[in-house]
Every structure is written in structure tokens, then in C-alpha cells.
A protein has these predicted regions:
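Charged, glycine-rich intrinsically disordered N-terminal tails and low-complexity linkers that flank
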Residues: 1-54
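Weak global preference for isoleucine
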Residues: 6-7, 16, 28, 50, ...
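Extended aliphatic helical segments
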Residues: 7, 25, 50, 57, ...
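A non-catalytic, helix-rich entry segment at domain boundaries
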Residues: 31-94
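Mg2+/Mn2+-dependent nuclease catalytic core
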Residues: 80-137
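Short, charge-rich amphipathic segments
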Residues: 2-5, 64-66, 116-120
Length: 137
């Protein structure tokens, strides 16, 4: 699955400040992947398989990070009331036509919306408060 079209963790701040920059970014060559990005993709895929397809945490070698993410989800939803979908494309309508990102989990508990984007703690530090990528969603 393609995780984003221009909008990602590193570009969201720029796009919020200057929506027109998306045209310039679209003309740039793709950035090479990093080992941090590749590990993050593996962990994101594992969370999707665990939550949506019943895979077992023990099946993954990086399971300590997965356990921390699942523990955080259990804090959000201790009574297992969450209705959710994983790997959800989020489109931005007329604000940024043709641009999308993906959040790792979109759901609700009664009338409360829950949007999660797993950050596994390697490479670039990411703050949850005022997080530009989540502000898009």
C-alpha cells in the first residue's frame, strides 16, 4: 500500500504553512529510503496484520515495540469498544486536491474519534502534541 502522496511526517509542517509547495515537491525526485523508514514500515505492517488479521505478536522479531504500541492502544480502549480500520487513506478534499496520507488506525469509541499513527521511536523524534501530520487527519 502506498502510505502517502506528498503528505508524510516530514512534509506536513511545510504543507500547512505553504499549501502551494506541493506542486514543487511533486517535481522533485523521490527521497531514498532509510533503515529507520524501512524498520518503521515493517512495524506498521506488523501492527496491521495483528489488528486486522489476527497475527500473533510472537511471530515478529521486533515484538517489544509492537507490545508497547498494543499496550498504548489498550490504554485508549481498555474495554475493547473500539470500532476501527487499519491503514486508512485520508484525503484532504479541496484543500489539497489529489493529496492523501495514511493513518495506521482510524476508529471510534461511541462518539469519540480515534486516529493513530504509530511512531516507534527510532531516527527522528516525533512529538504527539501539535503534530502536523495528525493535524491533517
Amino acid at each position: 500500500m502506498t502510505h502517502s502522496n506528498i503528505v508524510g511526517g516530514s512534509s506536513a509542517k511545510r504543507l500547512i504553512k505553504c499549501p502551494g509547495s506541493r506542486k514543487l515537491v511533486a517535481e522533485l525526485p523521490p527521497k531514498p529510503s532509510s533503515s529507520y523508514a524501512e524498520e518503521g514500515s515493517r512495524l506498521h505492517d506488523a501492527m496491521h496484520m495483528i489488528l486486522s488479521h489476527g497475527a500473533r505478536v510472537d511471530d515478529y522479531t521486533d515484538n517489544e515495540k509492537l507490545i508497547l504500541a498494543l499496550d498504548a492502544l489498550n490504554e485508549i480502549d481498555p474495554n475493547n469498544e473500539l470500532e476501527f480500520a487499519t491503514e486508512v487513506n485520508v484525503h484532504f478534499g479541496g484543500f489539497l486536491a489529489g493529496v492523501f496520507g495514511s493513518c495506521d488506525l482510524a476508529g471510534r469509541i461511541r462518539n469519540r474519534a480515534i486516529l493513530l499513527d504509530w511512531k516507534f521511536g527510532d531516527g527522528v523524534s516525533v512529538a504527539a502534541e501539535e503534530n502536523e501530520q495528525l493535524m491533517f487527519y
